[in-house]
Amino acid sequence: MKPQKSLRARAMDILSRQELSRIGLKRKLAPHAESEEELENVLNEFAERNWQSDLRYAEAYIRSKSRKHGSLRLKQALAQQGIDEETSRNLLPDRSSEKLAAIAVLRKKFKHPAADLKEKQKQARFLAYRGFDADTVQTALKHAWDENWEDGC
């Protein structure tokens, strides 16, 4: 039988594989903690030593997801992980980048412009589900297949 890992060693193993928010790390460690106090001590130590950073997690998350998802969805996902709204707002991509991402996502999913209203609504729902706001959705639907429109955000 393997010896039990300490909570600190488990946290180190988890963070060596992926960036996590404090809440995410707490969720993973909670079943292995003997007490809430022990868990909080480990989380505080890791935060003080900058081994776990909510800011670093938010940056990595946004960098990996911003090409496929809009600001609304990114903000919601970060809020679920305990990242405060101000940090999220500061890290989110600017409007022009988001519009270009929406166009890229739309072109990848739908190979041609909407032929009728039903198809246009389907495309709009797809972008809204991905977390793009109404203005971005309208811009993407209008300009996704324009050859001349590059960065006219």
Swiss-Prot record:
NCBIfam families: PRK00117.2-5 (NF001055). It is found in: Cytoplasm. Modulates RecA activity. The gene is recX. Keywords: Cytoplasm. Transmembrane segments: none annotated. This is Regulatory protein RecX. GO terms for cellular component: cytoplasm. Belongs to the RecX family. Its main location: cytoplasm. GO terms for biological process: regulation of DNA repair.
